[in-house]
Amino acid sequence: FKWQIEERGIRDQRVLRAMRKVPRHEFVSEEHRQQAYDDHPLPIGHGQTISQPYIVAVMSEQLRLDEGSRVLEIGTGSGYQAAILAEIVAQVYSVEIVPELAAAAKTRLQRLGYHNVEVRTGDGYLGWPEHAPYDAIIVTCAPENVPPPLVDQLGAGGRMVLPLGPAGGRQALWLLERQGRKIRKKRLMGVAFVHLTGRQAPTPSPFD
């Protein structure tokens, strides 16, 4: 990943170590294993993808994680991003709306020894309130607006990274940071993610 990640500006050594350690080929199908370490997304079935390594690194770095952090992930997919997080933090909670993907990711993560990841099937728009508040929230699929339930579940000083924009349209990666009662919002870069699915995904956000 040297050219893909380090030479493109990723500096967080915890993220870099995790990216080197996690076997990305274990998170893709047999037919895509030769491309597992290429810097582009790959299909994982059910209309979903595993994100390109550089974007995984960018999003992980922006969260400013430490080993005591508790993280909520929306969009488990293959489980790759959760594994990266699990190498860095104490506990990861991950929500996946596609039951087959959730089950496969849970089995895969357990097999690889990531016992600090909990996976559940559910509507990611609603988050996982039972374990809130979170130090960090990462969303790996794009809602059109910031989901208010996720903002509510972000702890004091917490950071959220998520793509925003319409399916098939112009999207951007955003960083949200809770500062007291305010949410500071910063645009990071243009991106292209699969759309957040779920019955409440189109609900307007008060932060847009």
Q: Whereabouts are the PLM-identified features?
A:
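Class I SAM-dependent transferase core
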Residues: 1-72, 80-84, 88, 101-118, ...
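Conserved nucleotide-cofactor-binding alpha/beta core module
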Residues: 64-184
